[in-house]
UniProtKB/Swiss-Prot annotation:
It comes from Haloarcula marismortui (strain ATCC 43049 / DSM 3752 / JCM 8966 / VKM B-1809). Belongs to the UreD family. One of its GO terms (molecular function) is nickel cation binding. Keywords: Chaperone, Cytoplasm, Nickel insertion, Plasmid. PANTHER family: UREASE ACCESSORY PROTEIN D. This is Urease accessory protein UreD. The gene is ureD.
Length: 299
């Protein structure tokens, strides 16, 4: 959980007191639980529990696949603040199909002490599918953000998991002024560990615009297409062909242990990276579910 012992890179921050509202105070520990099950009418949200800052307004008939269900996570707050600890748990039952996103970008606010953390756990039952495609994360100046996500796939399960990072309020000329960002993704399947991926950026210590990191680009995004029972080499080649036609600098590669494919994209605007990753998502969904991806519009 996000409130547990932090990653070693964040241990020093964890000892810093938060003056306005301590870690663990009401409104600081956000919890969201969603459970989807397959029913006679398709997929149904059978359990939901949310505490501030999370809120959902039911499900939406939004997906091109009739038997799928959609939830957009809402937040009444201005963003993620220092000392916030958020835990999200999404469970998709056997043969169920769910799409979960956020209604708007996650804004990680400027911090003077401590840090913010989010722990997301995704579980997909046998033959089920989950699309977890939130809006971008925007890292304001001096922010410190730890993001951990784990995915567990049952036999025959598939998932698409996406993440886009914007390193500041670009319209203001704010770029790479955050203090630390660490994102870790882990995936397991019926036979155990599939892969682990990490992004750790500390602009004050190492230049993220250096060659081999982000170079001349600003926005960074990744989409993981997790499909252990599919031919990852064939899927990787197909997705690579799709994303290299976009405006972003992008490519696709097969993940270890037959887990699926990772698609990465770099660009100067969030919209450019999102469009490229959406093209990959759309192609993957047609391959996995014989249905296109939903539109990225939320209004």
């Amino acid at each position: 959980m996000a409130a547990d012992a932090p990653h070693p890179a964040f241990e020093g921050y964890a000892t810093e007191a938060v003056p306005q509202a301590a870690v663990g105070s009401p409104g600081k520990d956000g919890v969201l639980e969603l459970t989807f099950e397959r029913t006679a009418d398709g997929t149904t949200l059978v359990h939901d529990y949310a505490t501030v800052p999370f809120h959902i307004s039911g499900t939406l008939g939004y997906d091109p696949l009739p038997e799928a269900d959609t939830v957009f996570i809402q937040s009444p707050t201005g963003g993620v603040a220092q000392g916030d600890r958020h835990d999200v748990s999404i469970t998709v039952g056997d043969e169920a199909v769910a799409h979960v996103s956020t209604q708007s970008s996650t804004k990680v606010q400027t911090m003077t002490c401590n840090y913010a953390a989010a722990d997301t756990t995704l579980s997909v039952g046998a033959g089920g599918h989950l699309d977890y495609v939130p809006e971008p994360t925007i890292l304001h100046a001096d922010s410190r953000y730890l993001q951990e996500l784990s995915v567990d796939l049952a036999p025959g399960a598939t998932a698409v998991v996406s993440d886009v990072v914007v390193p500041g309020r670009l319209a203001r000329g704010e770029r790479f002024e955050f203090e630390r960002y660490l994102s870790r993704v882990r995936a397991t399947g019926p036979d155990g560990h599939l892969f682990e991926d990490a992004t750790h950026l500390t602009p004050g210590d190492e230049d993220p615009t250096a060659p081999g990191v982000l170079g001349e680009f600003t926005v960074y995004g990744t989409t993981f297409v997790l499909a252990p029972d599919h031919d990852e080499a064939e899927l990787s080649d197909a997705l690579h062909a799709v994303v290299t036609d976009g405006d972003a600098r992008a490519g696709a590669t097969a993940l270890p242990n037959g887990a699926g494919v990772a698609v990465r994209a770099l660009g100067d605007r969030a919209e450019t990276v999102q469009a490229t990753l959406h093209a990959a998502w759309d192609h993957a969904r047609i391959e996995l579910l014989d249905a296109p991806a939903p539109s990225g519009r939320k209004y």
